Amino acid sequence: MAKQRKNAPGFEESVARLEEIIRLTEAPVTELEDMIALVEEGNKLIRHCRSILHDAELRIQTLSNPETVQDKTDTDEPDSNEFSLT
């Protein structure tokens, strides 16, 4: 299982929320301050999803060819257990 904080949303939940954020930001009635908050939340969710995908890619590489996979934990990718929407 992927390293995630218990309160961090999963990938599918994050993507669903991103889709909702897109709909809300496209709505002409969304106030500017609300739009800014939605964009900030969306950026955090995007980083979270990228981290999940990065971890999954490393796991797949390890399973596919465990002898040639280098330790890639020192990348600039955010750690999935660092998720916080606040």
From Swiss-Prot:
Compartment(s) where it occurs, according to its Swiss-Prot or TrEMBL record: Cytoplasm
Keywords: Cytoplasm, Exonuclease, Hydrolase, Nuclease
GO terms under cellular component: cytosol; exodeoxyribonuclease VII complex
Domain of life: Bacteria
EC numbers on record: 3.1.11.6
A Pfam family reported for this protein in Swiss-Prot or TrEMBL: Exonuc_VII_S
UniProt-listed GO biological process terms: DNA catabolic process
MF term (GO), any: exodeoxyribonuclease VII activity
Catalytic function, reaction form: Exonucleolytic cleavage in either 5'- to 3'- or 3'- to 5'-direction to yield nucleoside 5'-phosphates
Region annotation (Disordered) ranges: 64-86
InterPro entries in alphabetical order: Exonuc_VII_S (IPR003761), Exonuc_VII_ssu_sf (IPR037004)
PANTHER family xrefs: EXODEOXYRIBONUCLEASE 7 SMALL SUBUNIT (PTHR34137:SF1)
Homology family: Belongs to the XseB family.
Protein task: Bidirectionally degrades single-stranded DNA into large acid-insoluble oligonucleotides, which are then degraded further into small acid-soluble oligonucleotides.
Assembly mode: Heterooligomer composed of large and small subunits.
Protein name per its UniProtKB record: Exodeoxyribonuclease 7 small subunit
